């Protein structure tokens, strides 16, 4: 899809002066060398940890006119920079990244190789940013992370998990709603489930990808759980909050999946 889109862009600009072409994101980072070989049309490849540097990188390219690759991991530097940017004055709902990277290594996913290992932002930094958002008019905050419920920050020998963070955010007076995405079933702990009972600002909705309803396929995917485990989480949440709603992700036709198993994958 990436190469198809690059080809489409080339056609669009055939009769115009060529713009600076930047390919960014996880796939771009994983395919940097191949992209440079196949598409000399590309001027820069930028990894997900360097989005905040795009203006500076463009200026650098304009001076040197050389292919530029910015894909090094520097997640701490990125968050130090981003927290200095003021929140939009008009936003009612806003996103707040609390965690990056993943240690799960699902066989279909490139994230651990492009975003790096799991990193959790300092708790006080997140609370400060959330309070700043609320003071600027935000009333709903969605907590973000590649594996958001793996949030795990240590401070003075105290272990703060996603449940700890949600409980602290729940005490911010003018904040009305809290959401989070995207989660992994293995990190859906009982203390996090209890938040759906104890924290009135936590929206009773959960996006929890399972990827397949077939245990053999889940094993091939290296998901580290089976269907029974996933359904037990759903049942716990329903007992805590009968009104909770769910969404999920499914991969149909996973490599080495047999046609007769597709029905199980869907069920």
PLM features: residue spans?
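Proteins enriched for Cys/Gly/acidic motifs involved in redox and nucleic-acid/cofactor modification
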Residues: 1-151, 202, 206, 228-239
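Charged helix-capping and loop-helix junction motifs
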Residues: 3-6, 123-124, 157-164, 226, ...
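Conserved SAM/AdoMet-binding glycine-rich loop
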Residues: 21, 25, 30, 135-255
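Conserved small/polar residues in nucleotide/adenosyl-binding loops
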Residues: 259-266
């Amino acid at each position: 899809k990436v190469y198809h889109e690059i080809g489409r862009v080339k056609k669009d600009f055939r009769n115009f002066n060529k713009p600076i072409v930047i390919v960014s994101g996880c796939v771009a980072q994983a395919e940097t060398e191949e992209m440079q070989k196949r598409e000399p049309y590309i001027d820069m490849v930028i990894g997900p940890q360097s989005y905040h540097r795009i203006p500076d990188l463009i200026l650098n390219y304009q001076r040197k006119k050389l292919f530029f690759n910015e894909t090094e991991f520097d997640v701490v530097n990125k968050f130090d920079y981003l927290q200095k940017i003021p929140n939009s004055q008009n936003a009612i709902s806003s996103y707040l990244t609390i965690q990056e990277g993943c240690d799960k290594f699902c066989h279909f996913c490139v994230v651990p190789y492009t975003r790096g290992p799991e990193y959790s932002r300092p708790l006080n930094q997140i609370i400060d940013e959330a309070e700043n958002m609320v003071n600027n008019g935000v009333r709903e905050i969605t907590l973000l992370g590649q594996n958001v419920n793996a949030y795990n920050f240590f401070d003075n020998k105290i272990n703060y998990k996603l449940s700890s963070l949600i409980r602290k955010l729940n005490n911010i007076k003018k904040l009305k709603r809290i959401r989070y995405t995207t989660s992994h079933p293995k990190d859906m702990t009982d203390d996090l489930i209890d938040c759906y009972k104890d924290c009135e600002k936590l929206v009773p909705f959960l996006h929890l990808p399972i990827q397949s309803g077939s245990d053999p396929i889940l094993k091939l995917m290296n998901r580290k759980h089976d269907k029974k485990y996933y359904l037990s989480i759903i049942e716990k949440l329903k007992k805590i909050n009968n009104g909770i709603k769910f969404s999920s992700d499914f991969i149909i036709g996973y490599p080495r999946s047999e046609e007769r198993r597709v029905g199980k994958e869907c069920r």
